C-alpha cells in the first residue's frame, strides 16, 4: 500500500519509573474511538524501520507492522521480559545457546490479504542481518553473532548463532525489526522506504507529507480483541509550542517521545487531573561527532579540546530545568552494572571535576594543533528538545576556549542525508536505543565499517577488537573491565565521539488515554494495539 498524498539481555539494570496520579489502573479496556497523537518531527526520513534510527519513523509507522518478539507491553521497562508477537511461544535455546527455533502463528495476513509465513519472517531478518548491496541496515552490527537464518517449513524460523551471547534476545526484540513481504523485497528491497504494507494492528489509510498519517483498525489482527482503537492519527509537528497547544486544547491526546519539565508544569497547571504524567530514565543521549575526514578534526588534539571545554557537571542541573536532559554519564546507560561510577568518569577527558584545569588544557591543545580561534559549523537537527537547546549551550561552552562556532539546523530528512553523505564538520546526533542492553547500546561507538550509523568517518581496529572481546565475554567482572577500557579508548584516547548528557523522559498525556506504559525508550511499545480511550 503506497502512502497517498493527503511514518535482554541478561544484565539487570536499575531503572527509575514513576507514574504521577491519576495512575494506570486495572480498568476494563473499552473498544472504539480515534487516538490523535503528536509526532515531534517534520517528516520521517523514510518509512523503512530496518534503515532508520529515528522516532519519526517508529512513531509514524510502527502501528502498521508486526515483529517476531517484543518487550511485554504490560512491562516495557524490563530489559528481560520478552513476549511473542508473530511467534507462538518464546523458545529455549539449544546447542549450548547457539540455536533458537521459533514457531510462527498460522493464519496471519498482510494488509493486502496475502498470508504471512516463515518465508516472510526469514526474508525480513536476512535483510536486517545481511542486507543486499546498496541497502542500509541501521543496526546490522547488533547481529554479528548470527551465523545463518533457516526456514525448515512455512511455520518455522531457526536462528543459528556463531557464539552464545546474552545480547541476542535483546537484539531480536528491537522495535525496528518489522516483518516485510518477501515478494516485495525480492522485487525491490528499497520499496518499504516510501511505502507501508505490514500486518500490524492498524492499516494505513493515508499519509499527507509533513502533515499527518492516518490508520484504521485491522479487523484481521491475530491478537484476539486487539486493537481497541478504531483508528489513529499521527500529527507531524516539529515545534513544541504547536504540540503543547494541541494537547492543551484536546486536539491531540499525547506525544509519546517526551516533553521538558516546563511543559509538564504548564499542562498540569492548566488541566489538573485531566492530565496524567508518566516519567522514566531514558536510554538516550546526544553526542557531538566530529567528522574525522574534515580538517582539523582528523587531529585528536582538536577533538580532545572540544570535550575538555564542556562543563557537564555544572551544565546538567541548569539544562534539566528547561530540557529533557538530566544525567552526566559516559557511553553506558547510567545506573546499569556496566556504567562508570562518578569517580571513574572523572578520570576521562571532559569529565574532570575542575573545569578551569580542563579548559586550560583545551586551550593548550588547540594552540599545539595550530587551531587557536578555530571557527567551524555545528550541524544540528531542527527539533527543539533537546537538540537546539543543547546546541546553543555547546556553542557558548566552546566560546570559552576561543572557538567560534556557527550552529546550522536542518529538518530531519536533510539532516540525516548530511550525516550519511559526510557533508558536515561537526554534528550533534543521538545514541538512542531501545531495550537497555549496554553490550548492544555501545555498538554505536564502533567505526562506520562495522556500525553504519557511526558518522565520525574513522577506522579503528582497536575499537573493533575491544568490542568483540566484550561481546564474547561471559564473566560480568571481566566484561565491566573491558567496558571501561573501551569507554576510555572512545572518549579519552581517541575522542571519536563526545557524550553530553543522558535524557529524562516526561510524557504528559490526557488522562483518558489508557493501556500505554512508559519505558526507558521512546522506540518501545509503539504499535498502540493495547491503547484505549476512557471516554
Please give the residue ranges for each predicted region.
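Surface-exposed binding/hinge segments that line
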Residues: 7, 103, 116, 137-183
Amino acid at each position: 500500500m503506497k502512502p497517498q498524498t493527503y511514518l535482554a539481555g541478561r544484565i539487570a539494570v536499575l531503572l527509575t519509573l514513576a507514574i504521577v496520579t491519576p495512575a494506570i489502573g486495572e480498568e476494563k479496556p473499552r473498544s472504539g474511538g480515534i487516538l490523535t497523537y503528536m509526532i515531534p518531527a517534520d517528516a520521517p526520513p523514510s518509512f523503512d524501520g530496518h534503515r532508520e534510527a529515528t522516532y519519526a519513523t517508529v512513531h509514524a509507522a510502527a502501528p502498521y507492522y508486526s515483529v517476531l518478539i517484543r518487550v511485554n507491553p504490560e512491562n516495557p521497562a524490563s530489559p528481560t521480559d520478552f513476549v511473542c508477537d508473530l511467534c507462538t511461544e518464546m523458545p529455549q535455546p539449544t546447542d549450548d545457546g547457539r540455536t533458537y527455533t521459533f514457531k510462527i502463528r498460522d493464519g496471519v495476513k498482510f494488509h493486502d490479504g496475502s498470508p504471512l509465513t516463515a518465508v516472510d519472517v526469514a526474508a525480513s531478518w536476512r535483510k536486517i542481518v545481511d542486507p543486499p548491496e546498496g541497502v542500509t541496515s541501521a543496526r546490522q552490527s547488533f547481529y554479528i553473532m548470527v551465523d545463518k537464518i533457516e526456514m525448515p517449513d512455512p511455520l518455522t524460523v531457526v536462528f543459528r548463532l556463531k557464539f552464545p551471547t546474552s545480547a541476542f534476545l535483546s537484539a531480536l526484540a528491537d522495535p525496528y525489526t518489522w516483518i516485510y513481504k518477501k515478494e516485495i523485497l525480492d522485487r525491490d528491497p528499497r520499496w518499504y522506504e516510501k511505502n507501508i504494507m505490514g500486518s500490524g494492528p492498524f492499516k494505513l489509510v493515508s499519509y499527507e507529507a509533513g502533515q499527518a498519517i492516518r490508520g484504521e483498525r485491522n479487523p484481521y489482527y491475530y491478537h484476539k480483541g486487539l486493537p481497541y482503537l478504531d483508528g489513529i492519527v499521527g500529527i507531524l509537528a516539529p515545534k513544541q509550542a504547536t504540540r503543547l497547544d494541541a494537547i492543551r486544547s484536546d486536539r491531540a491526546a499525547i506525544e509519546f517521545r517526551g516533553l521538558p519539565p516546563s511543559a509538564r508544569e504548564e499542562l498540569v497547571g492548566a488541566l489538573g487531573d485531566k492530565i496524567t504524567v508518566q516519567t522514566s530514565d531514558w536510554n538516550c543521549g546526544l553526542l557531538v561527532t566530529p567528522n574525522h575526514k574534515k580538517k582539523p578534526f582528523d587531529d585528536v588534539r582538536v577533538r580532545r579540546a572540544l570535550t575538555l571545554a564542556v562543563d557537564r557537571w555544572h551544565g546538567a542541573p541548569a539544562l534539566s530545568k528547561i530540557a529533557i536532559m538530566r544525567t552526566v554519564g559516559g557511553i553506558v546507560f547510567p545506573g546499569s552494572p556496566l556504567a562508570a561510577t562518578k569517580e571513574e568518569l572523572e578520570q576521562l577527558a571532559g569529565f574532570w571535576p575542575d573545569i578551569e584545569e580542563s579548559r586550560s588544557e583545551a586551550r593548550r591543545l588547540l594552540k599545539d594543533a595550530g587551531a587557536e580561534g578555530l571557527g567551524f559549523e555545528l550541524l544540528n537537527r531542527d527539533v527543539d528538545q533537546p537538540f537546539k537547546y543543547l546546541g546553543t549551550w555547546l556553542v557558548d561552552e566552546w566560546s570559552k576556549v576561543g572557538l567560534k562556532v556557527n550552529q546550522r539546523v536542518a529538518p530531519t530528512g536533510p539532516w540525516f542525508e548530511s550525516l550519511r553523505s559526510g557533508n558536515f564538520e561537526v554534528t550533534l546526533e543521538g545514541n538512542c536505543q531501545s531495550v537497555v542492553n549496554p553490550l548492544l547500546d555501545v555498538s554505536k561507538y564502533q567505526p562506520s565499517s562495522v556500525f553504519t550509523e557511526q558518522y565520525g568517518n574513522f577506522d579503528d581496529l582497536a575499537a573493533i577488537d575491544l568490542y568483540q572481546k566484550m561481546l564474547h565475554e561471559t564473566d560480568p567482572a571481566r566484561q565491566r573491565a573491558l567496558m571501561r577500557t573501551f569507554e576510555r579508548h572512545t572518549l579519552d584516547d581517541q575522542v571519536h565521539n563526545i557524550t553530553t548528557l543522558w535524557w529524562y523522559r516526561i510524557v504528559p498525556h490526557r488522562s483518558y488515554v489508557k493501556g500505554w506504559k512508559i519505558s526507558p525508550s521512546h522506540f518501545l511499545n509503539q504499535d498502540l494495539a493495547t491503547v484505549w480511550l476512557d471516554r
